[in-house]
Amino acid sequence: MAHSRDLKRLVRELLADNGWAARLPELDALPARRLIGPLFSLLLDPDEIVRWRAVAAFGRTVARMAESPPSERGPGEGLEAARVVLRQCLWRLNEESGGVGWGVPEALGETLFRHRRLAMEFHRVLASYVREPECGEGNCLDHVPLRRGVYWALGRLAQAHPDLLENEVPTLLAGLQEADGACRGLTAWTLGILGATAAATAAPALAALLADSAGVALYRDGALEQTTVGTLAAEALQRLAGSPGR
């Protein structure tokens, strides 16, 4: 069995491959607990696309860990082990950890997208990272790149479990007022995904962003695209207009 450094190298080679998505089952053949360390490390990779693919692999791996059948569980497997990994994510976003937590919000969001039970348990704390202190739990992140990651994570969560974000529409509406353009754009993207849940209150605020030319890097459908706040606002409005009950 490969040592940790060798395993990280093997995982990175897979994620850097153009056919990486088709090769993800190769990672499924390995114990999930052994992949967590290498994947945490690869969230810091110099190559942006490798970092995003590490996010995808991280969520897939933790969800697999949570769903491992009792007969196949060893140390570090099962739902509680997956919870421990997500608590590690929360720790890495804590100032007391001494780190910055690059890529951690995205990895957390990808995991919640892939596992309903974990999403039910952790979605509120995820949203709390962009709630302003006066209406949150004191978790609000000041570092702009991390806030971008949280807004992306909320959008990813909304793709699978929009009902869990019904109470977060005010949080997202506040996100449309962020000073950072990428935060505004990612929030607009998320509100569009929520559809009817956000339609009544979000449409006017989104319309106000149609001329916003600030650039946004958005990872979706396995690819990184460069777009603008205005484009994402228009896309969101189109989705809201087509929402049932609208």
What are these regions (language model features)?
Residues 125-161:
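Histidine/lysine/aspartate-rich catalytic loop segments that bind and position anionic ligands
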Residues 102-105, 142-151, 183-186, 226-234:
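Alpha-helical solenoid repeats of the armadillo/HEAT superfamily
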Residues 59, 63, 109-110, 151, ...:
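Structural signature of alpha-helical solenoid repeat scaffolds
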